[in-house]
Amino acid sequence: MDDSRVQLWVKTDPFLLGALQIPPPEKFSMHYLRKMATYVRTRASEGCYPRLCWCMWRHIACGKLQILEETAWLYFETFLSVFERSVAESLNWAEVASTCPSSEKYEEVKSKLSVDTLKFMLFLYIQQINKISLRSPLIGNEWPSPRGRSPISDFAAQSSFYNKVWDDYSHYNFIHNHLTYILELLMEPNQLSKVSQFSHCILISAEVVTALGFVIEGTVDKNRVVNAFLDLAIWQPVQIKSGFIETLGSFSFQKLQAWIKECLVINPFGITSCIKSGTKLSWAQQVDGLNKRAKVACNTYKVPHTHRMVVMSQISKQTLAKSSKTLVDARVKIHRCSDCYIYLLSPLRSVTVEKCQNCTIVLGPVQTVLHIQMCYNVKIIAVCQRLSLLSTTNCTFHVLTPTRPLFYCGNQGVVLAPFHISYSMLEDHMAHTGLATVPNSWDRPFFFSTESSNSHIWRLLLPEEFFTFVVPFEMEGDTTEIPGGLPPAYSTSVQQRQQKIRMWQETVKDAGLTREQRKQLQAVVEMKFNEWLIKTENRHQLDSLVS
């Protein structure tokens, strides 16, 4: 094959699922990460290299980088759960963590966890994509730019906090502009001093190239098959350009860097391609009187299974309900929807809900991150690995999650509530995504911001405010109850309300009403029910279900 056909691109998941949407700690800079790289390599026998155990990362993070232990665990757990654990390993960890009899035993179990050292350092470095630079407004981008500006402004957040984690162009520019630093971070420390003067003599090991595969992949057959980065770099036709020296099993630093930059393109499976050339789905109705048309696009029919994506925008004044192979393991973005009910009842890879208002969104299990940002008066119901919130107002979240809900900045009026639905395939979908009913940390938020956890930011839903929620669709499957059940206080509240209903029914039954009186009572009840439907805006949901 002609080596000119090799294309490399930046993976979506490390940025979409791994880059926490807040400026990174000050000591995640290159200076301190280089020190960390030297430290871990010189302490390989102590659990630092080639795999970094939790105890040593905690020591480095708290003692050297001066971040809190719970923040150190957040980064470690995010990398481990999203990028290293299989579905079976996730279910096994859930069982182990939930059966620990004490906090001491839990810490003992955690001490046995480890991550790939080089990939984890790269994971820490890419947190810089959300770094706020005071110089950037002054210096601007390189001109003329080697790549155009991203055309997805209609779908990306164009606010004070720009949503770079979805933007393929931001991913491309970050890796292209920081490639030298990344290679320096991953290489042997004793090679670092030679970079400026003897870069042509420096060799990069195969394990470094393997680590680069955390953020880079590619193809040689026009995207029909996706190849690991190392496999492409050692492919015989490109060895001269990639700098691979087969007898040494190493790469020339200078040639490898030049080859990557030459072959690097915008991700052909990213959101840009999905919007521009993906399949347009007719899932949503077009509502008269609205300025913008509802849009649903996917790349499912054109990409490998592991790169699926669905983008939904401008859904308004309707109910959209789907359980589809198109959604299975897809990264889903729901953008600028309003006054609607959305049911996506399939196992999902990740979900982002952005700039929506007055919506109820019911999701199948989300294998990784469910992220909500810049939404108003939205209700989300889901099982997920992690829930994260940024700049939300008056939103309610009924979630089952093994990790603490992550609060970034700008949230107000958040209500956390227990997960309270079931549908026939729910437990099968949970098993598919590696999510269990325990542990469940839905009511223990973690504030990864400078804001305090006072009452105007969040509260728990009061048991007397709690009502069950029925998914109004029939599916084949075995789930008939809420997985894990309800917390005792909420279960008691439901039982008390049901008891009052039974008592009222008995009262009516024993009242000895005539047939005419029963008709009158029924008419009054129906009238009051219709008034309630209109007042709560549930009438719209019923009407849209019928249509």
From Swiss-Prot:
SUPFAM superfamilies reported in the protein's UniProt record: C-terminal domain of adenylylcyclase associated protein
Keyword Cytoplasm: yes
InterPro entries: C-CAP_CF_C-like, CAP/MinC_C, CAP_C_sf, CARP_motif, TBCC1, Tubulin-bd_cofactor_C_dom
Localization per Swiss-Prot or TrEMBL: Cytoplasm, Cytoskeleton, Microtubule organizing center, Centrosome; Cytoplasm, Cytoskeleton, Spindle pole
Entries under Pfam families matching the protein: TBCC
One term under GO cellular component: cytoplasm
Domain C-CAP/cofactor C-like intervals: 304-435
Protein name: TBCC domain-containing protein 1
Gene: tbccd1
